[in-house]
């Protein structure tokens, strides 16, 4: 029940986007020496960030990338592109700098954190943060993938990270 209260408290603190800051961000972009829309999705992200922070000029000095790893029980139905062993292998590879994401993180000086939220196979890799909700979800074709309590706990864990 504590997780449920934490989630409800966090939801109650979410405020509407600052549309004034978003308009100001769009105006600023229109004044920059570049073709309109030439930065693509980055322009949309900067407008949304202005709406969230209430400021047109934002900096993100250092980032941390979280990779939350878990297995899905519906793999039993043969609908997955890869076996569950790939979840574990990729999780370990991420901690060793052997994936595209980990190489990019290293290049830009960002921290990459791998979190076990439900890896099914056993492993020994101290670099993986254990926040497991169980050994993967259940097969949602046959039963609910997880309980409400598990889902809420997962969301609250993500918020804490």
Model-inferred region functions:
Residues 1-161:
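N-terminal loops that bind phosphate or other acidic moieties
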